[in-house]
């Protein structure tokens, strides 16, 4: 049996590089609220480990309609079980989760956590963008390639050379660890840079692109191979993740073709598979996503084939799985993750959405309507949900 665990704090555990990491209360709360999320990508017969009590009949009618055969078990009960897990599928791997599972005899898997941390650094973007085909045939002339900056002086020089730039910490949680610079040196910039240099050793410097669209290519690494899973289109607000499209790969690829040639997308996909087979396979098994953009430069559109690499499960794969398994192929929609200031606000939103968007099924799939994907308890402040229309 495979046991699934939603541990979004893993990104910060990797960033700090510590063998033991205690996340802040807001991250603990978020991981508890969304701990049922793996239900939607786990396989029949497997089990989701949760950090809260969820009634056995939660979403019973919906799960019956969708024929979901996945169980769940509170993490504390799991620790008391005598048998070791056949296979652990966490949201992400780090020293923290690996050491905890091994120490308690709950995982027989071997992971090179130091290598996984190295492979999770943003500096790997430089290696991908240096692939000859990408450098010569994909990116526009005048594109400023990301730079690894190891001193405040080198960061200052980079910022002054660019009208607008984005500085990134090598490791951070998604959408975090960014500093937007406007070509001037300020005390806050220096403080941020010095802090990142002290903790992580270098800063990534990148040009600010004229972004048209965010999307990703999703892959899965197995023991000997790397396979292409599909596309994901994601929605951001001020750099913060909000949700994903629920669409077919064909629909998303046709949309991308309005900006760039399909042959270019396919060639980049194949090159990334080769890159990950060479550098990642053998050290990591699981999902990974490559964040990309359609950018505009001098009135033309270009593919930015590697903004960031997420060496872990990600919301794009979740949305892709939901569409493939549970959404009527005549329908489309959106997958959202959202947080509220109070529990009452979340409950009011949930009640309003249920009333305004009744759930309709067709042939064991969702045809239209609203459905929450995570359990809403007495103190829940974050949730995942879908909105589908035909």
What spans do the regions from the language model cover?
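N-terminal-proximal low-complexity accessory segments that begin disordered
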Residues: 1-39, 44
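ATP-dependent carboxylate/phosphate-activation module, predominantly the ATP-grasp catalytic core
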Residues: 219-274, 310-337
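Peripheral (often C-terminal) accessory segments that flank ATP-dependent C-N-forming ligase machineries
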Residues: 328-390
């Amino acid at each position: 049996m495979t046991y699934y665990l939603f541990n979004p704090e893993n990104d910060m555990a990797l960033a700090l590089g510590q063998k033991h990491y205690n996340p802040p209360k807001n991250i603990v709360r978020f991981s508890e609220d969304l701990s049922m999320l793996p239900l939607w990508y786990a396989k029949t017969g497997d089990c989701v480990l949760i950090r809260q009590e969820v009634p056995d009949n939660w979403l019973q009618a919906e799960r019956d309609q969708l024929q979901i055969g996945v169980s769940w078990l509170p993490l504390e009960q799991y620790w008391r079980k005598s048998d070791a897990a056949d296979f652990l599928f966490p949201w992400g791997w780090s020293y923290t989760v690996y050491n905890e599972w091994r120490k308690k005899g709950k995982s027989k898997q071997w992971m090179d956590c130091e290598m996984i941390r190295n492979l999770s650094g943003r500096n790997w973007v430089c290696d991908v963008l240096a692939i000859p085909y990408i450098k010569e045939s994909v990116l526009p002339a005048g594109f400023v390639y990301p730079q690894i900056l190891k001193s405040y002086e080198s960061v200052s020089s980079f910022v002054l050379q660019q009208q607008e730039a984005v500085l990134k910490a090598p490791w951070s949680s998604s959408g975090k660890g960014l500093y937007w610079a406007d070509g001037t040196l300020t005390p806050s910039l220096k403080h941020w840079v010095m802090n990142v240099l002290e903790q992580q050793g270098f800063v990534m410097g990148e040009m600010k692109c004229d972004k048209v669209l965010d999307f990703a290519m999703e892959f899965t690494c197995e023991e000997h191979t790397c396979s292409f899973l599909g596309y994901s289109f994601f929605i951001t607000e001020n750099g913060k993740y909000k949700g994903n499209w629920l669409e077919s790969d064909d629909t998303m690829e046709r949309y991308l073709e309005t900006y760039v040639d399909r042959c270019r997308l396919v060639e980049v996909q194949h090159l990334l598979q080769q890159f990950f087979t060479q550098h990642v396979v053998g050290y990591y098994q699981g999902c990974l996503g490559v964040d990309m953009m359609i950018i505009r430069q001098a009135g033309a559109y270009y593919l930015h084939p590697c903004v960031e690499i997420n060496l872990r499960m990600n919301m794009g794969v979740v949305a892709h799985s939901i569409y493939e398994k549970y959404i009527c192929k005549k329908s489309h929609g959106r997958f959202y993750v959202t947080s509220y200031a109070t529990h009452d606000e979340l409950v009011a939103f949930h009640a309003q959405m249920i009333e305004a968007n009744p759930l309709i099924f067709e042939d064991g799939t969702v045809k239209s309507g609203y459905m929450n994907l995570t359990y809403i308890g007495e103190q829940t402040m974050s949730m995942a949900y879908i909105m589908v229309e035909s």
